[in-house]
Amino acid sequence: MEKLTVIKVGGKIVEEEATLYKLLDDFAAIEGYKVLVHGGGRSATKLAAQLAIESKMVNGRRITDTETLKVVTMVYGGLVNKNIVAGLQARGVNALGLTGADMDVIRSVKRPVKEVDYGFVGDVKQVNDAFLADLIHKGVVPVMAPLTHDGDGHMLNTNADTIAGETAKALAGLFDVTLVFCFEKKGVLRDENDDDSVIPQITPEEFKQYVADGVIQGGMIPKLENSFEALNAGVSEVVITLASAINGNSGTRIRK
């Protein structure tokens, strides 16, 4: 199968000019087919504040009410996405910015209310792998914003890690897929205060033990759960690494 690299980058990376430019340089240098999925939470929070819209968070997750949905749609699908696309075009990468609503790329359902009502947040149900594969084979690089739709005319805010994972899983039957989660650390750390304490690889058994011991906690837990789900669904390799190291062999590799 032909190789495909799916890169997910967090908002902190794409919202700072210096780190964004470095990321785009490195991403442009990746050989073969590729997809970029991005966040943008800090920019959304900033615009919401400028518009006097309160940003509400529960356990690090945004509550997306009607006004907040307007903000994230503008920021994720507009400002952040188009800045990335323009930057890639300047580097000779023929990129196309997409939300889940465009060509029905990603359809989701509104998350049911349990302990917390997260509002207009979507859980992915379907990825249009045929359309994405057609784009990719034509030499177009999809740049995917963390927005989906429900098929009934409503946009939904959706976790970017989830979009990257579901996209990688959907395309794993058509390509040899490597999924890379990029953030501000060198990888999964044994000690969050020591940037050099990178765990080089993690198996499911080791993951359970690290969680039990409190080594892995917080937002890293769902990131790793997404990683194992992707591997079980046919993705060849999952890497968690520093954004500036996407072309190297550093970081943490997730193993089955």
Give the location of each predicted region.
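C-terminal catalytic "cap/lid" subdomain
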Residues: 1-256
